[in-house]
Each structure stands twice: as C-alpha cells, then as structure tokens.
C-alpha cells in the first residue's frame, strides 16, 4: 500500500534544531504509553468526528520529548460527499513548544479507499506499532456500530415472528451513532467491519479499548474481545452523534500512572445526564475482561437450570436497551433475563457477584428517548427468536455462545 511518509532526514533536522534552541529533543525508544484514536468517519458522522478531534486537541497533550504519544487515524468525507475520494491519514497529536496543539501528518494512505475493513485497520495498527513501540497501548474507535449483530441486519430481516410494536406515531429523535462502517457512494451502501474481523485486525493487546459506537455494550462483544484488552468502555444503548467525551480524554488516560477509566465513564454519564429532554439519553459500562469467564459460568448455570423458560415472549418483558421505534431490536438486559428465567436466590447471588466483579461501573440516564431504563446491569444479551435462522446461525459462531450455548 503506497503511503506518503516523512523521511528520516526531516526527523533528524528536527532533533538538531531542537538541540540548537535549548529545547528537549523528541523522545526515541520504547514509549511508556501510546493512545490510538481511530475515527472511521467516511459517513454521516464525519462532522461529529472532526469536532471530537478538535475537542481532543483542547485537552492536556504530551509533548514530543515525553515517553507518551497520541496517534490519530482519521478518515472523513470531503465536504460531506460520499463519492469524492479523501484518503485517510495518520496523525500525531501533541503540545508544541509554544503551548499550542499540533496535528502532524505522519502518513497519508493514498491507495486506501476503504478504511472500514479488517485489512485497512490492521495496516494502520501495524504502522503505529512500528513507529511507536510501547509498553502500553490504549485505543478508542469511533464510528457506527451494531455490537455483535451483522452490520446490514435489521429487525425487519427474515420476516421473523416477533411481538408487534405498539401503535404509536413516529417521533423524530436526535441522531445516534449506530464495530465501524463507511459509506460507499451513498448512505444506502455501507461497508462494515464485523465483530470477528475487528478482533482479528488488532495485532497487539491493549490495556483498554473504548468503543464510541452504538450498542457495543453487549456481553457477546465483550466476550469476543476479552483476550485483546484488559478493560472495555462500551454503551449498551445507542450513542448520540456528539459521541463520547473528548475534551478530557487524554488527561484521564495519560495524566497519571494508570488510566482512570472509571472517571472517564463518570464524565460521560454526567455529560448526558445534565442535558434535558431527549438529549438526556446515555448509558456507559466499564468491563474488566479478566472477569468475563466467571460471568459466563454464573450465567450458564442459570441457563442450564431454566432453559425451558427461554421463550420468545421474554422479549416483551425483559428490560430492553433499544427504544420502541428502533430497527435493531436484539439487546436485552442480561441480569433481568436471568431473573425472568426463574433463577433461584442462590443462582442470582452468584450472578450478582460475577457482575459486580466484571462490571466495576455502569450508569444509565433515567431513559433513552422514550425507553425507560429501570432494571439495568450494564450488559445486554440476545434473546433467541425461532424465526431468525440466519441471525441464530451467526450467533452460534460467537465465542460467548460457544461458552454458554444460548442458541443451540
């Protein structure tokens, strides 16, 4: 893949120039911490992602001389056009010697017409590893997303037998962000990075992974990614297009010896909870990936004991994470499902202990649009529907299902 890259002579000149002016030379060697931002915005989110990047640059940023670095992979539309090529680029974001933020282009991927693919993401992350070898990596991906559900699948597919929606007038809600997609020519033709491809695209283990994507807070996604990261920050509902919190992102990830992921989740929750009307809509979950196996064991015990109670009618009574007019109606609260399956007191105690360890923090606004959020544990799960043969077959390929056998 052809790329325009800065040549080493320029880097050498920068070092010499810094030395001649009494400035600290740029850091070389193995970095302590590298934060990677991936903004897949060649879609209707392009303007929002540009604003997020500007907010990130307003934060406390490391300087070139420090052993910490912020790297941003960005792919946006050109003036909102889905037909005009605009090559993605890799930037280094840092605080210059004058105190102002700098976005320095490291690489432009001229031949990468589609960034929403396993191959493209792997290329970029391999480049980051090569340019910035580090003891610790953290990553945030921002784009559309549908959790574990295939990107092109909606509730109307397969003509499944589901509970009819209550008759209600259509309401115009604020736009949300639906792991990663790109519009090819028009918004009706989107290419997605499916969950398992996303997992395959990450070449190194990261300390934390923040997904600024809709509906990422499902146990199926978390379990699929558990061996790639120590912690996940995800949302079981959709996310408004303003996205995660970016004006304090870098300081909370890099301002001390350890990333303060709980404080970041609290900042996200407070940002949305302080709004009013339909904009007061947000959920956030912090997952300790090392505790997911214990959660699977506790949930599997409930499922094995009460499988006969696993009926499609539960989709009408279990706490949902999708609002009534959504066309993605596959996300239900894991704990509430266990309770409605008829779990015993002992089984619920074991599940609650596993959830407390696995989900050290979660928070929800009182509602998301017109969906009341009343019985939430922070993780969603699928309730199988017999009429969805294709979706159920897809579910069988997930690591979570291999562990708990929800779909048989």
PLM features: residue spans?
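Catalytic-core segments of thiol-dependent peptidases
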Residues: 75-82, 88-102, 113-204, 213-214, ...
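Bacterial N-terminal signal peptides that target proteins for export
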Residues: 1-9, 235
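Short acidic, gly/pro-rich beta-turn/loop elements at beta-sheet edges
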Residues: 45-47, 80-82, 149, 221, ...
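Structural recognition of the beta-strand scaffold that forms the well-ordered cores
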Residues: 34-38, 69-74, 138-141, 207-211, ...
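N-terminal extension/subdomain marker
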Residues: 21-134, 395
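Terminal, contiguous helix-loop blocks that mediate binding/assembly
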Residues: 26-28, 165-408
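Hydrophobic helical h-region of N-terminal Sec-dependent signal peptides
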Residues: 10-14
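C-terminal motif of bacterial Sec signal peptides marking the signal peptidase cleavage site
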Residues: 16-19
